[in-house]
Structures are given as C-alpha cells and as structure tokens.
Amino acid sequence: MMADLKGKAGIVTGGSSGIGFQIANVLAEAGATVYVISRTGRPKEGVGESASGVVHLKGDVGNVEAMKAMVAELAAKHNGCLDFLVNNAGVSYKCRAENFPMEQFDNIMNVNVKYLFEMSVVCYPYLKKSADKGRIINITSMSAHLGFSEVVPYCASKG
C-alpha cells in the first residue's frame, strides 16, 4: 500500500511510457502532483490514460539551463519546494561491443549518467526545502548486474 502523498509534488523524468509512466500514475493515485518531463511532453500512443494529478511537460533533461528554469517554475507552484525526483529517463542502443558506435556510447552515458546527476543537482535546492527533506529515486536495471553482450554501455550506465 502506498503512503498518502496528498499535498506532495515532484518530478518523474522519462515518463511517457513504461516504468516511468506507471510510477507517475501510482504517485498521483496516492495524492501527489506529478510533473512528467519527457521529450514528447505527452504519453506515448497506446500506453493508456494518465492518472489525475499527472502533468506531462515537454523537456530535454540534457538542457541544464532549460531544466533549471522549468524546475524553478514548478517548485514555485508548491511554495518553492519539491518532495521527490524520480530519475527514470534512459536510452539504450543494441550493438555488439566491438562494433559499438562511440556517438551512441556518448549518448547513453550522457542520458543515463550525466543528465541524471545534473537533474539531481538542479532539483536539490527545492527538495531540501520539503518538510520531509525530499527524495531522489534513481531507476537502475538488472542489466547492470547481469550484463548482455549487445548492450554493454547500457549495462555499464545502469550500475
């Protein structure tokens, strides 16, 4: 059973489908206002309806200045604080390691590691103002522990 999150507000990155979409819905159903930041700004076709309390916003977590402005604007709606950040945005690319394009490697590391850290830093000042001191939840993957030959950089980025 989920805790009562009435009056709480926070951000889920990469929530237009999959795990992020479901996390956003569960948090909203528990009473939170959930801002989902994704490249499309809307749920992917066929994933269903978002719960009441979920607000989809178009944004690129790789654009730090834009995220600073967006996060400040969202926090301002909630007395200058946020209660949670769920870093869910992530990418992968399937290719054997010996043929892996470095451009794809860089993209995976940027999105799955660097941007996760940057988003945490951007949100931290607002999270620490929360009555509950806020929470940062980073979504990882079993791939980090199992390893798969066709997604080596993804596995490394999720550890």
Where are these regions (language model features)?
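Conserved glycine-rich cofactor-binding loop
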Residues: 9, 16-17
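Conserved glycine-rich Rossmann-like NAD(P)H-binding loop of the short-chain dehydrogenase/reductase
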Residues: 30-46
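Conserved NAD(P)H cofactor-binding loop of Rossmann-fold oxidoreductase domains
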Residues: 88-93
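Active-site loop immediately N-terminal to the catalytic Tyr-X3-Lys motif
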Residues: 98, 146-152
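Active-site helix of classical SDR
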Residues: 120, 157
